[in-house]
A protein has these predicted regions:
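Structured catalytic-domain cores with a bias toward divalent-metal coordination
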Residues: 1-449
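Low-acidity, Ser/Thr- and Arg-rich intrinsically disordered low-complexity segments
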Residues: 449, 453, 458-476, 483-513
Length: 513
């Protein structure tokens, strides 16, 4: 196995030359708070069907403000009508109702109530939401910009939304739906338990029941959509989420690759459904982590068999999909030190010498845009084509193990079409409207079994009895890092995984994005 120090020196080699070339070729950006000046730099992407805007962390104000400024420009000047974010659909739908003035809806403490609350309930998002509401007020209802959620984690909330909808439009169908979804009743509060129960033969899979429910809702599209097309779209999407979530929690024990791919496939399918519902010519903007919107084929993730929404968009739309990554060297970030732990404002360590962040940091430029698909920048793309490390901070940040927890190898000019650089960044500001996390009562379904009690701690205690399961999570980490918590990597597991890829450990340990 190669000496890590030799590999590190090889990646770091030539950084000064690359930084010098970037310094002369990149475009200096104003502060994103000056939206009218910042936004026009991104007019070059106005002809795309889909513009995907990334972030290197889930808690950096500069990234949120930059995405807001770019999004405003694309909406106002280039006809984009959909904003889709890495958030749960039911919460985003509440915001969508608010910004499109379509009945009960709000951006308040009821939105985005599950961990990590600060990711979408922060002042930067609130300001954008209020801008979008004001923008929509001035245009016809059928042309108003949508705000949608991409993610797969709203099992309980999506079940509740489907049942509420059917109670209103088809009470008999609601009774059937309750029986079908009753299969998932014991795990509504801790859905990760469901996968374990199926794995150990303690419960039959619920797949047939949730597939039947989705099929019935889709079969009644004409009947239901005549009453309210928007509400039907919402109910159908929630039924899709229940199916995807059932599959996700059932396969999460098989390893991180399969569950990651299912999640990002769901994100892509959601984007497709929203665009199709909007009609021909619809143009969308996606807000998600770099790890989702960059082309996974150009990263260690892809080299290990994973794909993401960015890669799927490139395959589907080609040059009509613009993947824009974001990076920073240092500053502060809103994050937790473990899953379901309180938010902290943490200091972001200066980047490693063998990372892309260090290359851009050596330019000495506070903010810049590097257009990697501009033919005039071919030299820059060639210089950046040597694989280097890239940092990814999710909702969990562990500075003490940053190399293993947050760095992965990538080829940046193949991963992104453009790269937005901030030398120093600051954490998001928790929204003044955010109260304590909502305590939701279990959904009443057709089942005699009580809901599973206990949180992540009891879940970990339950699985630690199985060395095989514990090893899977020790080695891959992703499933629990994403949904419940992160287990420490065992030394033996690290060694085994390192034989597969020198960066397998670093991409898996705390992948909370």
């Amino acid at each position: 196995m190669a000496d890590p120090k030799i590999a590190e020196r090889a990646r770091a080699e030539g950084a000064d030359q690359v930084a010098s070339a970037i310094r002369h070729a990149c475009e200096h950006l104003p502060a994103p708070e000056r939206a009218s000046e910042f936004g026009p730099f991104f007019d070059r992407f106005g002809d795309a069907r889909v513009v995907l805007l990334g972030e290197a962390t889930h808690g950096t104000a500069d990234f949120y403000n930059a995405r807001a400024a770019i999004t405003r420009r694309l909406i106002e000047d280039h006809g984009f009508s959909i904003v889709v974010v890495e958030a749960d659909w039911p919460d985003a739908n509440r915001v969508d109702r608010y910004v499109r003035h379509r009945g009960p809806g709000a951006y308040d403490e009821e939105c985005f109530a599950r961990f990590p609350t600060w990711m979408w309930r922060n002042e930067e998002v609130r300001e954008f939401v209020e801008w979008l509401r004001a923008h929509n007020e001035e245009i016809a209802p059928n042309k108003r910009v949508e705000f949608r959620g991409l993610d797969v984690y709203s099992l309980r909330g999506s079940i509740a939304e489907v049942l509420t909808y059917l109670d209103r439009v088809d009470p008999e169908a609601a009774k059937t739906a309750r029986k079908r979804y009753g299969c998932l009743s014991p795990w509504q509060s801790e859905p990760a338990w469901y996968g374990r129960a199926v794995l150990h033969g303690e419960h039959d899979p619920c797949e047939d029941a949730v597939v039947a429910q989705l099929s019935e809702i889709l079969a009644k599209r004409l009947q239901y959509s005549r009453k309210d097309g928007e509400d039907y779209l919402d109910a159908a999407q929630n039924a899709r989420i229940v199916l995807a979530a059932e599959q996700y929690y059932r396969i999460m024990y098989r390893g991180s690759t399969e569950s990651w791919n299912l999640r990002d496939r769901h994100m892509f399918n959601t984007l497709q459904h929203v665009m199709e519902a909007r009609g021909s010519g619809a143009k969308a903007i996606v807000w998600a982590h770099n790890s989702h919107i960059g082309n996974a084929a150009a990263t260690a993730m892809g080299w290990q068999g994973e794909f993401n929404i960015g890669e799927l968009c490139k395959t589907a739309y080609g040059d009509e999909a613009a993947l824009i990554g974001f990076g920073t060297d240092r500053g502060t970030v809103a994050a937790a030190d473990d899953w379901n732990e309180p938010m902290q404002v943490m200091r972001v360590l200066p980047s490693r010498a063998d990372s892309y962040e260090r290359v851009f940091g050596q330019t000495g430029i506070a903010r810049s845009l590097t257009d990697l698909r501009d033919p005039r920048q071919s030299e820059i793309s060639e210089l950046l084509a040597k694989p280097r490390l890239e940092r990814a901070i999710g909702v969990v940040y562990r500075p003490d193990t940053e190399f293993y927890s947050h760095y992965f190898e990538a080829v940046l000019p193949e991963q992104f079409d453009a790269y937005v650089w901030f030398e120093e960044t600051r954490a998001v500001t928790r929204s003044r409207r955010c109260g304590r996390m909502a305590c939701r009562r279990p959904i009443r379904l057709a089942s005699d079994r009580p809901p599973v009690r206990g949180g992540a701690t009891s879940f970990i205690a339950a699985i630690q009895g199985s060395s095989e399961t514990s090893f899977k999570y020790s080695a891959s980490g992703q499933a629990l890092a994403v949904r419940v918590c992160t287990l420490p990597i065992e030394p033996s597991a690290s060694a085994n995984l390192a034989r597969l890829s020198p960066f397998a450990v670093s991409t898996k340990e705390t992948r909370s994005f």
